[in-house]
Amino acid sequence: MLNKLCKILFFINLLLVAVQSYASPPPSLPAAEIDTKDKDVSSNSDISFFDKFKQFFSKSKKKNISPKQPNEQTKAANQEEPKLASQEHTEADASEPFIDTGNTALPSVTASNEHENSVNLASHDIQESNETEASKPFIDVGNTALPSAASNDVHTNTEHENSTNLASNIITPNVPRPIVSMPPAQAGSYVVPPQRPVQIYKPTNLPPVHKPIPLNPSPEANKEEESVAPIAPQSIPNMPAVSPPVVSPPVIQDTTTPSTMPTTVPPAVPSNVPAPPVMPTNQPSTQPITPPSPNTPVTTPSKVVPTTDSSAEINNSQETFVAVSDVPKKQDWNTPLIPVVVVKPNQPQALEKQVNNNQTTNNQEKSPPVSSSNVTIQKQDDKVNNETSESTTKFVKDETQMLLLPDDDIVLGKLTEQATLEQMDMYAYIELFQKKEEWIASAKRRKVVESFIKYDNDINKKKDIYANLSYCKAVDNAFRAVDRNNLFGLRALLDVYPILQEKSRSGETLLTAAIYNDNYYLAKFLVIRGIKISTLNDECQYPLDIALAQGNANIACMLIKAKGYQ
């Protein structure tokens, strides 16, 4: 039994070692952590059952170590106890934030055998704690100076300092401890504190919101458009063209010969309603198909009222007749409108006769005659035109009286003066009479005021006072204005009378008269108005010759220039 138990324990140890080798992270830097709790304070409640199981087998393994150096084992055991307590404390406080404690002394690496044994024992415990911390994030220490190799004296001094620090520390709850201790400060060296990693976000290329429309779309886009296109409505197959049915005139039977088979009349088909499609059949039709004419009247069924004759047999259930209605239900736009004649209310019979005459003249075809004299046909009355209410009839009578009264008081929607006076009361009539009297009394003063306001209505500002003279006197006044150098008077006369080319009694023209007076402005004005330069006077002299004889160089140059244009 003992051998079996040993084998079982051996296999369990092998499994644990294999699991630790696969699950343990890479070895961390050697660091001595400071424990702020006593050995008795640390509770075993935070340690899981699996960790306790591993510790049990690890302790049993430590007991088998050969006691080669008893002093070294005691020292290692003394160093192992605070490290185990610190490992338990770090497992509970691993979630707390990192706090840098500054320059903390780290144990220097020595080449002595004592330190190597202690490191080996501590590394075994560190591997056990790393299994629980494998899932936690890796903390980068940063640019931390590693401890340098030193002598045994330096190591003993640092151990003594750490022991004094542990004794002086006070246990404070919820105070985080440094995870990594800093090396001792030496002359000429400094420690760089760890820096928090900065996350750099790279810009992402977002897709454009509006895609550019290509000039030449790809065939794939056309396929997409075709797939998105709306579904076309189902096309109805074309029915065979069939002419509309034609209603043939019925055969009228005499009442004296009773018939056993009733005659059926097809219903009336209005002109504006399309005929329903008729499915073709293999049976030939007995009636010929004729195209309907647009002037064919609409046939409607009517009731038959036979006369009560003793010699004729009455059978209303078997005889039906068709009559043409005189008044159509709907007005056709191709036919002329029927004029409405309004007469006095005491002549109703004449109105009915005139309307009936107009209706019979507008209808192109009449109803077919009935052979039997014993049958009377009742015409279908128009409900819209004939069946009127009492209020409509009264309104028509009132309108007739208003339109056809000889002494009408309404003209273009306004009451006449006589009707206004008749509807006035006494006070309004007296006030109106006083206004009219004042209007008549102020007629003279009103004329004076109007003449003062409109004093210039009969005066044409482009005319002169000589405009009212006769044509002959106008010519004399024109030459008189030239002699007096009156340019404005001459202009007013020329605007009214066509006297530009006229001559005076002495045979002079207006241009020669202006040259004799040496009036350059009058001569230029006449040339601009279009007077003839080549006209001779009674002495057979041209205007240019007179200007040269008078020695007026300005008029001569003006005439020479103007002669080239005439």
Curated annotation (Swiss-Prot):
The keyword Repeat is annotated on this UniProt entry: yes
Region (Disordered): 61-118, 276-314, 355-392
InterPro entries xrefs: Ankyrin_rpt (IPR002110), Ankyrin_rpt-contain_sf (IPR036770)
Biased composition (Polar residues): 101-112, 365-378
Biased composition (Low complexity): 296-308
Top-rank taxon, per record: Bacteria
A Pfam family of this chain: Ank_4
Gene3D superfamilies xref list: Ankyrin repeat-containing domain
Composition bias type Basic and acidic residues, residue spans: 78-92
Name of the protein: Putative ankyrin repeat protein RF_0987
Organism annotation: Rickettsia felis (strain ATCC VR-1525 / URRWXCal2)
